[in-house]
Amino acid sequence: MELRTVWWENDAVCLIDQRKLPHTMEVVRCTDLAAVAYAIRSMQVRGAPAIGCTAAYGMALVAQQSVALTPSALLTELVQAKATLDSQRPTAVNLAWATSRMLRRAEAVASEGVEAIKHALHAEAEAIFAEDLAMCHAIGEHGASLIPPRGHVLTHCNAGGLATAGYGTALAPIRTAFAQGRPVHVFVDETRPFLQGARLTAWELLQAGIPQTLITDNMAAFMMQRGQIDCVIVGADRIAANGDVANKIGTYGLAVLARYHNIPFYVAAPSSTIDLATASGADIPIEERDPAEVTHIAGVAIAPQGVRAAHPAFDVTPNELVTAIITERGIVRPPYLAALRQLESGR
């Protein structure tokens, strides 16, 4: 049975509080828009596809709870809800993609009345979830062929089932190759400062029985130098039209290291993460988070009181460092500007 990160239950958006993993499996019930927005901002739920699914359910929740008497009044509420949700994590394009799709669906059925909008949005949120899950499995099928025979893969952050509707993006090729009986061993970057690798990816791989070794972020170069890494597979929060990739802070450094050591560097992401309206990585907004997440771990200070800390949550990897992008429609290779447009036109 696959892990489900977010779901609709008894008129509420339910999700696993990923801040509590791996020690506690706690389900959070979001009963209003404010709770959904907080879940996204506080990283109770995280990972671009999972955020998109959560936001879609959040829009459906707003519609269900609305007392609007006319479609136009309900649409106004939904526009406001979209603005609230979109502002929570600005780097992840799946968030605005999902809320935009929900709003378009509401507008499409507005002539049928308020109840039609409510029913349509609930169905659309479920469709977004189901599509994301299917895309993850397709990414796994396409990407498994890229894993070298020895199967030593380095990952960064968490782009597994917890970050998506299920199965994952970066972990999907690994899981598929493992299911095919091929040798796989995953080197898991701990991923400071939020430790998504150590807390979440390591936990997911343990649940799946996939061999792994947890490493600190500053061990990656050493592991590459010693010949321990055959390829790198990461996820993405936004892919610009030219193939530049925004992902968890530290991804860019791994891409530079991989290029120096002649190691393939792959990005796995659904097509909903591709943003053709963003020309390059220079145009991607980079979220700045609370410096306390750097100076503290699990509420415990690890730095002197009063020290200043930087905390950009993402960085941008230039397209020339990306060997290929694995999508649900196939593997995209350079030149990305033309290849990504061709991929999108094939929808």
Swiss-Prot record:
Keywords: Amino-acid biosynthesis, Isomerase, Methionine biosynthesis. NCBIfam families: eIF-2B_rel, PRK05720.1, salvage_mtnA. The active site is at D237. Coiled coil: none annotated. PANTHER family: METHYLTHIORIBOSE-1-PHOSPHATE ISOMERASE. It comes from Chloroflexus aurantiacus (strain ATCC 29366 / DSM 635 / J-10-fl). Pathway: Amino-acid biosynthesis; L-methionine biosynthesis via salvage pathway; L-methionine from S-methyl-5-thio-alpha-D-ribose 1-phosphate: step 1/6. It catalyses: 5-(methylsulfanyl)-alpha-D-ribose 1-phosphate = 5-(methylsulfanyl)-D-ribulose 1-phosphate. Catalyzes the interconversion of methylthioribose-1-phosphate (MTR-1-P) into methylthioribulose-1-phosphate (MTRu-1-P). The keyword Iron-sulfur does not apply. Gene3D superfamilies: translation initiation factor eif-2b, domain 1, Translation initiation factor eif-2b, domain 2. Substrate binds at R46, G47, A48, R89, Q196, N247, K248. It comes from the Bacteria. Belongs to the eIF-2B alpha/beta/delta subunits family. MtnA subfamily. This is Methylthioribose-1-phosphate isomerase.
